[in-house]
Amino acid sequence: MKYYCNPINVNYRYQFNKDLENDKIYINREAADPSMICFKGTYYIFASMNLSVWVSEDLVSWQVYKLPENLPLYGYAPDVRVCGEYVYFCASESGEKCNYYRTKDIINGPYEEIEGTFGFVDPNLFFDEDGKVYFYWGCSDENPIWETELNS
């Protein structure tokens, strides 16, 4: 596995979006808390409070695509992981039950929902080489970082 530290040039601005169903205004930050993966030879960046994913084949030129509406698009600190033929996605919704989603096609979907049982912040899935799956979460000066083994 390789890691890169690269000042990727993507928009970082605030967006104001109106939810037409309940007449509320949402503010979205672009590029905060990024999670980047390489899936099938293409790079993807997911960020907090965002409606989109940035996509690149060379880590230099980036295009932005809107994600499906059923994803937690207003969540914080998205966690995106590749395991086999699937990409797993979730984002923090403290105080609310958080679900994971998986897909074989990030841009077009469909996304299969994996129902969660509790709320968390700053999630992180870990797929171990021995086939076990672990889930880590936590971000607080008052609470520890938590970990549990998941049924795979």
Whereabouts are the PLM-identified features?
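Carbohydrate-active catalytic/glycan-binding domains of CAZyme proteins
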Residues: 1-152
